[in-house]
């Protein structure tokens, strides 16, 4: 899952007027790094901490607990966390001198990868907790209050979601009309460049009943759009009411029946797990938005094999054709890596050719960075940094051109726009198009959550502009 996805958003603090006892509650500041799943995890940790009297704050200075929810995907991720912990150590010392206590916790994938090393290198840290054990965070903090320094990164036998509360309606409403919902975690693909199997573990799917219960609570609390999350979300599997095997497509058909829930999305997918049921869901479900993030990483079969992607460029292109046949208006997004070990100029040209053929609405691209413990780090023929950078620049120029062309192709179209949040100008709201673009339109704050018909009138640097086409629906 890309850490720079357009879906990325920070958890929002609940306004003080919505707190039951805002004057006496303890405050938690959560800094979220990385992917959408970390955003979701931060929200679930915040909800769990609420039962122990913690309420979120956006002001680190008033926080009784500072929690870093970390990501281990990019190069030097751990060192960036240690740098942040050094700054927090000084803040903790300053608060202690003023007679105020501040606890520091590290969660997420760096916590999983580093474990005890964090306590050794950052003595100010009180709690280290992994992504599979954060349901035990309140207990870890209670132990830390008693003077223990806690590391809890062992993969839990129990299902953490069975022990996590679903947020109260007031907290859901404060977060807006769109929401993330994790349905699957971990990955069994073992791509040679990726740390996810080592930090998130093997593939685990949440039960249908858990997912439906949470989705219904979100919809009842005013959420209009849900994005299903997973490191390999289309590997999700479960059982229907009669015990029959369900895939992600079956789950989407079920969620589309929930009253009030107008839109569905999912991310991130692996090409090998795009089955017929899921493809047909794009054909049949009006609630399933015509947008698909389907990473390919390279257009070279030789590099795809070295990456252990388990598909060829031709198979990926054939899959794209099948999807576009059933949903011609679908917009595609992807992930790319330049400079994987052994990548030649011809391999890179294969990637450019694939991009030209697919034509992406948006995409995310990165230079290859070695991740300790992955097979890719041991490969010979590491590509020089300057060549990685030059290839990345060329690729990004092509992807940006395609993104701009897609945005311009939307001008003049009438679309359904979900109004999400205030814009920069008075009497302006920002909405989300079916293709995940931000759209600016004149509207009142009372219309947030409405889906209105608009006509796209122009493009900006990272957004579109629109005018009303007809009344709200």
UniProtKB/Swiss-Prot annotation:
Statement: the UniProt record of this protein carries the keyword Iron-sulfur: yes
Residue ranges annotated for the Radical SAM core domain, each copy included: 173-405
Family affiliation: Belongs to the methylthiotransferase family. MiaB subfamily.
Domain (TRAM): residue spans on this chain: 408-470
Record protein name field: tRNA-2-methylthio-N(6)-dimethylallyladenosine synthase
Function: Catalyzes the methylthiolation of N6-(dimethylallyl)adenosine (i(6)A), leading to the formation of 2-methylthio-N6-(dimethylallyl)adenosine (ms(2)i(6)A) at position 37 in tRNAs that read codons beginning with uridine.
Annotated region (Disordered), positions in chain: 1-21
Primary site of residence: cytoplasm
Pfam families according to UniProt: Radical_SAM, TRAM, UPF0004
Organism for this UniProt entry: Rhizobium johnstonii (strain DSM 114642 / LMG 32736 / 3841) (Rhizobium leguminosarum bv. viciae)
Cofactor binding mode and count: Binds 2 [4Fe-4S] clusters. One cluster is coordinated with 3 cysteines and an exchangeable S-adenosyl-L-methionine.
Subunit description: Monomer.
Domain of life: Bacteria
Binding site for [4Fe-4S] cluster 2: 187, 191, 194
